[in-house]
């Protein structure tokens, strides 16, 4: 399904998009016993407290229709089933721990935004606000401004499809303005699959960004593993991004490099690993 949350101000549009996604997923299942949701933003008791997905929605409409949007969508679609709504970064980290079968994992999903979460040494989600998408990683005065936080140089502009789109013209790739951000990403990914050197430059640049940023993240979390997820990491581009990142870490930060392990899951898990982890969250009572 196609859903453009960041450019739509109508909360009913968002509700309809979420319901459509739920129904689409249900069509592939024999039944729905529970629903787990992975979504960008801050969620408390399954309620949307703050989320860049809905940045265009006016405050009064946000309070009236967005705070309980997932609760309404789930109960209206499936009735009284257990459900859990969790920040997508935390779910990324949980997916990482499940994939690696180990703890102390920083999960980073690069898609519409940058989702970062952390699973501690005991294998638990901490409940911290790991919204690193809005933590500055570039102090240059000319760095891009994030339209939601108002800050410059935020991670979201370096570790998401926004970064690919931003770098495309600098690499000599002109993308049609009529395309959606996700469609623009697909164009670059298609070129990468054809071993286009212009597309390769984009992923190499993001790999360099990531190496320097992971050291900053390490000073905060002291993680042991990093698992990279999301559609930006799909295909040959993701492999090149990871290889570049590892080379920069080894060359410029050997001490940190010896302490951490970077990994990519298999292609399927890169795309849907968060969904699998989210589905494990609700408690089903016998």
Predicted feature locations:
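A mobile "lid/hinge" subdomain adjacent to the ATP/sugar-phosphate binding pocket shared
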Residues: 3, 9, 39-44, 151-208, ...
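Stable alpha-helical structural segments in soluble proteins, enriched in small hydrophobic residues
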Residues: 21, 25-29, 93-96, 274-282
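Internal alpha/beta domain cores that form substrate/cofactor-binding pockets in large enzymes
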Residues: 201-221, 231-286
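Active-site metal-binding loops of divalent metal-dependent hydrolases
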Residues: 89, 112, 232
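Phosphate-binding glycine-rich/basic clefts of nucleotide- and phosphate-handling proteins
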Residues: 15-20, 24, 30-32, 121, ...
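Glycine-rich phosphate-binding loop and adjoining helix at the ATP-binding site
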Residues: 2-19, 31-105, 140, 237-252
């Amino acid at each position: 399904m196609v859903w453009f949350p960041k450019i739509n101000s109508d909360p009913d549009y968002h509700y309809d998009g979420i319901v459509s996604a739920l129904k689409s997923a249900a069509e592939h299942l024999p039944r729905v016993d529970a629903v787990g949701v992975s979504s960008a933003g801050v969620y408390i008791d399954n309620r949307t407290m703050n989320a860049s997905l809905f940045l265009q929605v006016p405050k009064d409409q946000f309070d009236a229709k967005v705070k309980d949007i997932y609760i309404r969508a789930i109960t209206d679609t499936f009735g009284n089933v257990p459900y859990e709504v969790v920040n997508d970064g935390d779910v990324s980290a949980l997916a990482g721990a499940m994939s690696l079968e180990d703890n102390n994992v920083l999960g980073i999903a690069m898609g519409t935004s940058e989702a970062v979460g952390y699973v501690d040494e005991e294998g638990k989600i901490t409940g911290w606000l790991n919204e690193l998408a809005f933590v500055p990683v570039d102090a240059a005065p000319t760095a891009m401004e994030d339209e939601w936080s108002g800050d410059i140089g935020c991670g979201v502009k370096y570790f998401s499809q926004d970064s690919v789109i931003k770098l495309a013209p600098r690499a000599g790739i002109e993308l049609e303005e009529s395309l959606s951000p996700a469609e623009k990403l697909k164009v670059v990914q298609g070129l990468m699959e054809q071993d286009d050197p212009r597309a390769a430059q984009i992923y190499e640049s993001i790999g360099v960004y990531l190496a320097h940023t992971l050291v900053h993240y390490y000073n905060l979390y002291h993680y042991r593993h990093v698992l990279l997820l999301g559609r930006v990491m799909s295909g040959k581009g993701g492999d090149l991004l990871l290889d570049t990142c590892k080379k920069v870490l080894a060359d410029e930060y050997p001490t940190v490099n010896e302490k951490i392990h970077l990994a990519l899951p298999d292609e399927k898990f890169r795309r849907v690993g968060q969904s699998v982890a989210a589905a494990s969250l609700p408690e089903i009572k016998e």
